[in-house]
Amino acid sequence: MNRRRRLLAAMLGGLLASPRAEAQATMPLETTGSTLCEVRGFATDRDPRGSNLRAAPRADAPIIGHVPPRSNIGQNTWTGAEFEIVGSKDGWLLVHNGDQDGDLKFDAAHAEDGRGWLSARLVGTTLRVAALRSAPRRDAPLVARLAGDNWGPDSVAVSAVHSCQGNYIEVTTTPIGGKPVRGWSFKPCSSQLTTCDGGITE
């Protein structure tokens, strides 16, 4: 008798939970108050299960998609999914596939839009220009110049991505032989094994 009651309770619980799950799955993407940007990045999450994409820039927002785990391409070299970064808010980045063959996967309600929120802690980028500025504009004061006799900006490790605005991304990075600095970099790329394409100047 107890077994039958438990079975009925489980079935009823599933039925009651279904409308809520469906409502979460169809929750519209929240973009109010976010910045707009046009930069690129890649996934850095070490979790073998990958990362969740959410409907809003907060950890308790409904999950609407998934970023696949990083791939080991040999000799302890890992690469993550690449994507466009089109917005930011409160330490979260709004990421976008860019094309139908992109690595990001979405539920049916959000697949056509192809955007979702990913924690900035799980995102990396490759810097393209030497100037690191105090604000996301060309005339802002320099924080650091990421270049030396034998190295350039794409040789610098980005330890954290914070936000983005326009064609700029805000990062913490460490110049070779220097201390960590935080600032804004112009037009980063998502290359992980090679340098960024040339021809871009701030």
State each model region's role.
Residues 18-20:
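N-terminal signal peptide c-region/cleavage motif recognized by signal peptidases
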Residues 25-39, 45-89, 125-164:
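Beta-loop motif signature
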Residues 3, 46-48, 73, 77, ...:
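Short linear motifs in intrinsically disordered/low-complexity regions
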Residues 24-40, 87-139, 163-202:
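Boundary regions of SH3-family modules and the immediately adjacent low-complexity/disordered segments
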Residues 1-15:
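N-terminal secretory signal peptides and thylakoid transit peptides that target proteins
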Residues 7-8, 74, 88, 113, ...:
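Acidic, low-complexity intrinsically disordered regions
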